[in-house]
């Protein structure tokens, strides 16, 4: 790809063009097609650009850290999320992987949701939207007419995602979530099926997810009735057997692979205590269902991702700087996003509320107000993992064997403990996230195992995420996988 060889200075660090040999042809072709910027001729230059960008905090670059981050990436110990690799240090898009937003019930709130989606999708982020508070089909409106329900408005988002793309890397992607008790749940779970029903209420370009809870699972277990309750009137619209509804969900998943299933009771039980004390609540997951963050009328949750490569666990697990550097890197990138949207110098104070915060949004950045506020308050990041199956293969360990279970516990215990330690160290210098004041942590959320479809390709074809390699020979178009990478 590049005729340059050996070690050379580049952007204030030393890169090694010979490390291109660690990549296979598919990796290099993917990088060249989607991720190199302007005059870049080698993946090493892209890795260096992203490393320098991600080692900069409040306009001060730590070049020693940038060198280490570059070394980690070029040795395939980890990979930047594709938004960081594609957009970091450039003028195209944002380095954020995930946005989670809330959809209100009024016309103004619905149209505001469409406008926010346009901003977020065109800037590089995948979106997960919560629709459980939108009144159901047939419910009366303030004008005296009858509501058409939430699905026709999801159809607008469906078209929106086709219209707005994310540059050359991915097209706009969106996952709609609703509650298992919503009256439209039966239609919602099959809205991605091409056959059956009204074509104008089909959303073939969206993903969808169903929020369940422990009460529903108990009803399935005991074969009880389940009430479908309109979120506006709070009245039961229909009563259905819980097992019948559960069976329909499983049938839809067998046919289309979706809807995702998220148990909100489990998610909210694990919410940091500081956020519980503020009355915050998780209402949905994100585009690829790997992270759960609180959302509401004032908050569009933000998450900045990257992933370690477990294929090289034996190497990087001995490096005491590795996880510390990656958590610091993700916090830096999140700070770039916040600084891009808000005038922090004029904001004043460390613990601003939404009303004060939105007064200091920079001109032209109004579409990111809720996202920047959420990032500022909770500073959530998501360090994930890929290469699990590749590690097992390299060590002749059966995927379903006891040694695989042992490695699983060992690897993720190391990642979690190291990430918590890193977040505490960063908080000593930069302060705790306002949402979790008193926790000693910089970040309210630290880990998220993303699908890594593109990142695994870039890492020389390592196995994606924690999934097994499903077959020995296959074709792939990662741009159409719509993953956060």
Which positions does each model-derived feature cover?
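Conserved, charged catalytic cores of large soluble enzymes
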Residues: 3-59, 63-66, 134, 143-156, ...
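Short, hydrophobic/aliphatic alpha-helical segments
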Residues: 21-29, 74-80, 110-111, 115-116, ...
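Function-dense linear segments that define catalytic or interfacial modules
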Residues: 37, 51-57, 70-94, 99-142, ...
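Short coil/turn connectors at secondary-structure junctions
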Residues: 94-97, 123-127, 170-175, 184, ...
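Non-catalytic terminal/interface segments that mediate subunit docking, oligomerization
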Residues: 295-296, 445, 449-471
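Internal maturation/activation junctions in enzymes
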Residues: 324-372, 376, 380, 395-452, ...
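Single conserved hydrophobic/aromatic residue that forms the stacking wall/gate
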Residues: 474-485
